[in-house]
Amino acid sequence: GTTAWLRTAATAWGIEKEPFEQAIAPAVARANLGLDRYRELLTGRKAFLFPDSQLEIPLARFLARECGMELVEVGTPYIDRMLMDEEIALLVY
């Protein structure tokens, strides 16, 4: 999500990988600390997302990758491939 977006911007601006990683490390650590208690509650649980708003794919990616949830089904009313292909690729790992 955010890291991928920031990495794309950093690459476009010619920022090397090491300075980029150093710059985002405090924010990543803070985010991980904030998510720890939720991971304990959500890891291994199943999620079924009904189609509603086109946010299902990014939400599913977050729940699976960051919170350890198992995705049973992810429905979406519409998929704009130009916007969602990278998110969809992150659902399968």
Give the residues covered by each predicted segment.
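An N-terminal assembly and electron-transfer interface module characteristic of large anaerobic redox
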Residues: 1-93
